[in-house]
A protein has these predicted regions:
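Short, well-ordered beta-strand elements
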Residues: 22-36, 55-59, 149-153, 275
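An extracytoplasmic/periplasmic, membrane-proximal ligand-sensing/linker region
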Residues: 36, 162-177, 184-201, 213, ...
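Ligand-binding pocket segment of bilobal, Venus flytrap-like solute-binding proteins
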Residues: 68-70, 76-83, 153-234
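A conserved helix-loop-strand patch within extracytoplasmic ligand-binding domains
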Residues: 100-154
Length: 330
C-alpha cells in the first residue's frame, strides 16, 4: 500500500483539478458596447479561462437587454459592468426570486458625476475647490462668444445629464455670477473643450463624469457645492425637467455592479468568488481608458496591458495559485 499511496494522491489531485474545470464549464459574459465594460469583460474572460479552467465566451450585450435576458432566460451568466439604477427594481426582483446575484461592484467608487475645474487652477486659487470660490473668480472663465459672460460647459442637448446640470446651475445661481451655459454639441465637443483649455492652461468649468479617458489624461478637481448629497432631492427634482425650485446637491454615486445568474453562482462557487472581489477604482479605470484611447486599443489589447502592467491590482482578486496560472498564460 505504501507504494500506491503517492500514485493515488496524484490521481486524486488530478481528479480534483478536472472536477474544478468541469464545475465551471461554459460561462457566457456580456461584452457591453462601451470601453470600460468591454475591458472588464475581456479581463474576466481571460482570468476565468486561464485561472479557473472555465470555457469563457464573450457575447454582445447592453444594459437593458442583458439585464432582461438574465432575468427571463438565465443568459448570459455574467454582466461585468451593469449601471444598475436604470433597472434596479427588476434586478432586485430577480435576486428575490433567486434568479440573480449582485456579485460585487465593478466600479468600487460608483459612477461619478460633478462639476470640474483643472487642478492647476486649484493650485493657484485653493478656494476654487468650492462653488463659492469658482463664483468669486467667474471672470477667469472666458466665454467663447460673449466677453461679458463666463463659460459653464454643460452636457450636450438630449443627454439626461443636461437636465441635472441645468437644474444645479439654477440652484446655485451661477447666472447671477455671470456664468452662461454652453452646449458643447457632442461628447467630443465637451472633451475637446477640456483638452483645449488644458493645453493652453486656461480656466475651464463644467460638467463631466468618471470613469473616462479625459479624467485619466487631465488632472481635474471636482468642485464641492457645500451641500453634501441629498438623494431625495436629486431623484425628485434635480433630474426632472419640470423641477421648478431646485436645491444644491452633489451628485450621488451611481452604483455599478457585476451581476451573475444564481445558476452560475451555485454551479461555480470558486469562479463566482472572483467576481465578489474584482473591482476597479475610478482613478485606475481613468488611466486605463486614457491608455486605450491614446493607443486606439480594443478591449482585448487593453486587457493584456492591464494584466501585464497592473499585477498589484488583479492578483489581490484571486488565490495565489490562480494568479500563477494567469501570469503563465500571458
Amino acid at each position: 500500500m505504501t507504494y500506491k499511496t503517492p500514485l493515488l494522491l496524484a490521481i486524486g489531485v488530478l481528479a480534483a483539478t478536472n472536477a474544478n474545470a468541469s464545475e465551471c464549464g461554459t460561462v457566457t459574459i456580456a461584452d457591453m458596447n462601451w470601453n470600460s465594460a468591454t475591458l472588464i469583460a475581456n479581463v474576466d474572460r481571460f482570468i476565468l479561462e486561464h485561472g479557473y479552467g472555465c470555457d469563457a465566451e464573450l457575447i454582445p450585450g447592453d444594459t437593458m437587454p442583458t439585464g432582461t435576458s438574465m432575468i427571463e432566460k438565465g443568459q448570459p451568466d455574467v454582466a461585468p459592468e451593469l449601471w444598475s439604477n436604470s433597472l434596479k427594481d427588476a434586478l432586485d426582483k430577480g435576486v428575490e426570486e433567486k434568479r440573480l446575484r449582485y456579485a460585487g461592484k465593478a466600479l468600487v467608487d460608483g459612477g461619478e458625476e460633478g462639476f470640474w475645474i483643472p487642478a492647476y487652477l486649484v493650485k493657484q486659487y485653493p478656494e476654487m475647490k468650492t462653488i463659492e470660490g469658482v463664483k468669486k473668480h467667474a471672470k477667469l472663465f472666458s466665454h467663447p462668444e460673449d466677453k461679458a459672460k463666463s463659460a459653464f460647459y454643460s452636457c450636450p442637448a438630449g443627454w439626461n445629464c443636461q437636465i441635472s446640470a441645468g437644474n444645479l446651475f439654477k440652484a446655485m445661481d451661477l447666472a447671477g455670477s455671470g456664468f452662461d451655459i454652453i452646449d458643447p454639441g457632442s461628447s467630443a465637443g465637451l472633451s475637446g473643450s477640456i483638452a483645449k483649455a488644458y493645453e493652453r492652461e486656461e480656466a475651464w468649468f463644467g460638467y463631466y463624469w468618471a470613469p473616462t479617458a479625459v479624467l485619466g489624461k487631465y488632472d481635474m478637481v471636482k468642485v464641492d457645492f457645500g451641500s453634501g448629497v441629498d438623494e431625495k432631492e436629486f431623484v425628485s427634482c434635480t433630474t426632472q425637467a419640470d423641477c421648478e425650485n431646485p436645491k444644491p446637491t452633489m451628485y450621488p454615486p451611481s452604483p455599478v455592479h457585476t451581476i451573475t445568474t444564481e445558476e452560475f453562482a451555485s454551479r461555480s462557487p470558486a469562479a463566482y468568488n472572483y467576481f465578489t472581489k474584482r473591482g476597479f477604482t475610478n482613478a485606475d479605470m481613468n488611466q486605463l481608458l486614457a491608455w486605450m484611447e491614446d493607443n486606439q486599443a480594443d478591449g482585448e489589447e487593453t486587457m493584456f496591458h492591464f494584466l501585464e502592467n497592473y499585477p498589484q491590482i488583479w492578483t489581490a482578486w484571486v488565490p495565489q495559485d490562480v494568479a500563477k496560472k494567469v501570469q503563465g498564460a500571458l
